[in-house]
Design a protein with these regions (language model features):
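Charge-rich amphipathic alpha-helical interaction elements
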Residues: 1-114
Length: 114
């Protein structure tokens, strides 16, 4: 492999290493928001009950319609988008490394055949 090709592989490895913390944080944020969404719904349903909505269906409707719940959903959307963006960048870097491994293996086999 050319020196430039090897440099690209090290860049891919460095990318994975350098972005692992950001990916972990994005994933943690997404998981937190998924669970917080449930807590927020419960809190909003309780507030709806106190406001006089006695059935669970009415409480749920009020919770889903609440602007605070919608804000949680928007934050979850952003968190999922960031997590997926980082994940696919990681997958691309891993694929570059796998291609390099395959090419290097083929190169070694060719050398043995000569």
């Amino acid at each position: 492999m050319t020196e430039e090709g090897e440099i690209q592989i090290f860049r891919a490895l460095n990318f994975i290493r350098d972005n692992a913390p950001a990916y972990a944080k994005a994933k943690a944020e997404r998981i937190y928001l998924e669970n917080f969404r449930k807590s927020k719904k419960a809190l909003l349903m309780r507030a709806a009950e106190i406001a006089g909505h006695k059935s669970a269906a009415l409480q749920e409707r009020e919770a889903y319609a609440n602007a605070e719940y919608v804000d949680v959903l928007k934050a979850l959307q952003v968190a999922v988008e960031e997590e997926e963006r980082l994940r696919w960048l990681m997958v691309a870097a891993e694929a570059r490394i796998e291609v390099w491994r395959t090419l290097e293996s083929s190169r070694r086999i060719e050398k043995k055949m000569i």
